[in-house]
């Protein structure tokens, strides 16, 4: 899950810390040292994690947007300036903004807040924010709880005694409580020094950033894998005394099933399953990450020559169009499947079902599923034209179709450019031209985007005027016809703007002689 590191750069972080036998450090130096340790760990063990860096005092600033380049994050730590008083609320508002803008409100996120425990003074201080949170309007609400699933980890550049001498610890605990109890406060054990800061950040790493390694099993075949992101414990709400369920480190495949039978089931979370490569010695299992490029290349070459069950499983599921049912724990299952990342790349994914004996009602109880060979006759029929499970409806649902997505401007621009490219290749691309044109027309009508139809019509008329003299005469006729039909649809009248109506090619005939045409 993404991580936002929030660094306090107020004046209180410049307070000196005396360390015997060495130069004088400031608290911000200790914080930067701890974050460097965290970034180095993530660069080695959490390379797929997206991390952003935010700094704050009375205002907040996004220093590094979400990235996987941990060198950039470490460079930003050394370029931070000192500012004015502390205002934690503004930092939390900034976190809300950047996470929602990048990930929306459904993706879980971890927030690491690094501060010295000073709450600020006067208006804008944490004391003032907490005292007035119940007196605010909905438009000016306190940013906690975050409007997305989250965990808030507060790293204090102070020891427990220092925080308890004021009400700082109590106010910071209120932040965790306001975030629905999701998170934890870390303090320095003993005097403020580099060693104790490393120990504190080590506890955070053990809690939140330890990679999840497991053994994938299928009969006698096994493979060491990393599951990313780390699966979170799941608490069953219906239980009288709920106990968090944690998935086993032994993931055993209990069977295989057609994709059509399992369809698109509800899941708790989705995870990448990555085979763990051998290290450069080739005799121990590691993450495959080495000190330099030459060693890394040699390690990859060694790993590429060794057969791996994870690779075999991924390829088999992709070719056969099946998914593997995997046992996660007692009465808890998931599925392994191949998911296309692009036209040429796919990943082995694992989705977790809800715990229980019957997570997918149409399959029945998982414990009662068995191989086809146990049945008296093939439940799929001799020609593979039946299914032992409730059949899916013949009409595809909207989520199963290739719908037009214009969330970003680039999506709309791509669709318009596709129409123009086909327009320049008329009449050879007549069928493709009208197919793309009707797809855009339907989407525009569905969204009420009538101005788009007029705009595309103007573009087609312009393309018609730019046709070269050598162009086929049919091209001009088709472009003019398409532009006229789009302009009629842009009026919104029911006669020309029917959603189910398609623009058909203009019937022309240039096969006869010129005298016959006259």
Curated annotation (Swiss-Prot):
GO CC annotation: INTAC complex; integrator complex; nucleoplasm; nucleus
Expression sites by tissue: Strongly expressed in numerous cancer cells compared with their non-cancerous counterparts (lung, prostate, colon, stomach and skin).
Compartments it resides in: Nucleus
The entry's keywords: Acetylation, Magnesium, Metal-binding, Nucleus
Alphabetical list of SUPFAM superfamilies matching this protein: vWA-like (SSF53300)
GO biological process: regulation of transcription elongation by RNA polymerase II; RNA polymerase II transcription initiation surveillance; snRNA 3'-end processing; snRNA processing
Disulfide bond positions: none
Domain VWFA: 2-204
Pfam families: IntS14_b-barrel, IntS14_C, VWA_2
Residues the record lists as N6-acetyllysine modifications: 418
Spans through the membrane: none
Binding site for Mg(2+): 10, 12, 86
Chain's role: Component of the integrator complex, a multiprotein complex that terminates RNA polymerase II (Pol II) transcription in the promoter-proximal region of genes.
Quaternary data: Component of the Integrator complex, composed of core subunits INTS1, INTS2, INTS3, INTS4, INTS5, INTS6, INTS7, INTS8, INTS9/RC74, INTS10, INTS11/CPSF3L, INTS12, INTS13, INTS14 and INTS15. The core complex associates with protein phosphatase 2A subunits PPP2CA and PPP2R1A, to form the Integrator-PP2A (INTAC) complex. INTS14 is part of the tail subcomplex, composed of INTS10, INTS13, INTS14 and INTS15.
Similarity comment text for this entry: Belongs to the Integrator subunit 14 family.
PANTHER family linked to this entry: INTEGRATOR COMPLEX SUBUNIT 14 (PTHR13532:SF3), PTHR13532
Protein name as it appears in the record: Integrator complex subunit 14
Lineage, top ranks: Eukaryota, Metazoa, Chordata, Craniata, Vertebrata
Gene it is expressed from: INTS14
